[in-house]
A protein has these predicted regions:
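Short helix-capping/linker turns of helical repeat alpha-solenoids
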Residues: 82-83, 87, 121-123
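Classical Sec-dependent N-terminal signal peptides that target proteins to the secretory pathway
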Residues: 1-29
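TPR/TPR-like (Sel1-like) alpha-helical repeat modules
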Residues: 145-170
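Alpha-solenoid helical repeat scaffolds
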Residues: 88, 92-95, 125-129, 176-177
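N-terminal leader/linker segments that initiate helical-solenoid repeat arrays
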Residues: 27-71
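Single-residue signature of alpha-solenoid repeat helices
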Residues: 59-65, 110, 150, 157
Length: 186
């Protein structure tokens, strides 16, 4: 009986401690996991900035910072970016740049930003966005009866939508039907 009481007490203490630990862990406003520092302090700062992008406040200052970091990444070159230990976070800057600066930049610049994001990280939403952009271009080419552009854009729609379906594991019949239609362009 005494042994059973000690075990019961220990289980209660263990449960209480784990409850406190998980409560403390999940009550943090922003749980920041430290980045692995590199030789390039500017890129480390860019990684820190990328962690704030999911709560982008759309102020003029935020847009200016985003543009400045995109220019910084462009000046470093893709080879240097890929050497950084947190290079996928650098891809976030390109991805969010494409999303938030869509009204400011021309479509070709948005495409370039999404492609750079994909070069640094495999992410389904950028593939989907590119598929939509190329689908719109495809529709315009069909209306203008430009067969060369139709084939070019049809191929791109298939490529990016297929990557989206694979990465997102989306098994929707809608996407299968669209992929089947554009498969003739691959």
């Amino acid at each position: 009986m005494i042994y059973g009481g000690k075990m019961k007490r220990n289980l209660i203490i263990l449960f209480f401690n784990s409850f406190l630990f998980f409560n403390l862990l999940y009550s943090q406003e922003s749980l920041n996991i430290p980045i692995t520092p590199s030789d390039d302090q500017q890129l480390d700062n860019a990684v820190g900035f990328s962690r704030t992008l999911n709560s982008f406040n759309k102020s003029a200052n935020s847009y200016a910072k985003l543009k400045a970091y995109i220019n910084l990444l462009d000046s470093k070159g893709m080879k240097a970016l890929k050497k950084h230990p947190s290079y996928s976070r650098l891809g976030d800057i390109y991805m969010y740049g494409a999303m938030y600066l869509e009204k400011e930049y021309k479509e070709n610049k948005i495409i370039e930003l999404y492609k750079k994001a994909l070069e640094l990280r495999a992410e389904p939403n950028s593939n989907y966005s590119l598929a939509i952009i190329y689908k719109n271009r495809y529709d315009i080419a069909v209306k203008k009866k430009d067969a060369v552009k139709e084939v070019e854009y049809g191929k791109m729609v298939y490529e990016y939508l297929n990557k989206y379906v694979i990465l997102s594991r989306n098994k929707s019949a809608k996407y299968k039907k669209i992929l089947n239609y554009f498969s003739s362009y691959k």
